[in-house]
Regions:
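Short helix-loop hinge/linker segments at domain boundaries
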Residues: 1-11, 26-29, 70, 74-81, ...
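N-terminal winged-helix
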Residues: 2-49, 198-201
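Secondary-structure junction motif
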Residues: 18-23, 65-67, 107-135, 200
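A late-sequence structural motif
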Residues: 29, 177-220
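Hydrophobic hinge/microswitch elements
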Residues: 42, 51-56, 61, 120-177
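N-terminal segment of the mature folded domain
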Residues: 46, 51-73, 84
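Beta-alpha-beta core module
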Residues: 69, 76-82, 87, 149-197
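Flexible hinge/capping segments at coil-to-helix
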Residues: 73-89, 93-115
Length: 220
């Protein structure tokens, strides 16, 4: 078996818009042969991949409450965050959920329902969570490492998660809806790169496409 060197790679948190942007980029580039990589990672995994050069850039978000801590970690790793858009957090829940038709929700309204979230590395701070307001205590919570599993469990258990307002592909085929979350916290979505390094042509194309997707589907 011949190992082909990867010529372009992106690491990111578990957002489906990463996948769709990557697909759009590959299709636009075309070509008879290529070796690319798209890596779903924990927040620390995204930082490590970009800092080591394994990926050219990493897609992640920070909130108005976690930005200082996340940016400090990025700075220590020799990285910088480039914001593309701000968005409002939303509660993602199944179409059959009793709260699905609410005009807006608070986390108090969701206390009786299972909370699904993406598991982070054991020693990662709460600020590295992929969900806004992750530090709020929940009586029922389930950690997942896979996007499809999280979506399916939300439906099967009548649970919920807190996601971005970027609705493109949010259901992942699982039939999820989103409702605005009543909070002052804002999401800052963007990408991380190594300090002082410019993106290559493919990386810039990815970022340009990502920005268009985010602007098109963001909810405020």
């Amino acid at each position: 078996m011949t190992t082909t060197e990867t010529t372009f790679a992106v690491s990111g948190q578990h957002y489906l818009f990463n996948v769709q942007t990557f697909a759009h980029t590959v299709l636009a580039l075309g070509g008879d042969a290529y070796a690319y990589a798209l890596r779903d990672r924990t927040t620390q995994g995204v930082i490590d991949d970009v800092a080591s050069g394994k990926s050219e850039l990493g897609v992640l978000f920070q909130t108005s409450a976690t930005a200082d801590e996340v940016n400090a970690a990025l700075d220590a790793a020799g990285l910088e965050f480039v914001e593309l858009i701000q968005s409002a957090p939303r509660v993602a829940l199944p179409a059959s959920h009793p709260m699905v038709n609410a005009a807006s929700l608070t986390l108090e309204y969701m206390e009786d329902y299972p909370y699904l979230y993406f598991e982070q590395d054991e020693d990662s701070p709460v600020a590295f969570a992929e969900e806004a307001l992750a530090g709020v205590p929940r009586a029922k919570s389930i950690a997942c490492t896979d996007r499809a599993s999280l979506s399916e469990l939300i439906v099967a258990l009548n649970g919920y998660t807190v996601t971005s307002g970027i609705l493109v592909g949010i259901s992942d085929g699982a039939g999820l809806n989103t409702v605005p979350l009543n909070t002052d916290v804002q999401l800052h979505l963007g990408y991380v790169v190594r300090k002082g390094e410019q993106l290559g042509e493919t990386g810039q194309r990815f970022v340009d496409t990502l920005k268009k997707n985010l602007e098109r589907y963001a909810r405020f």
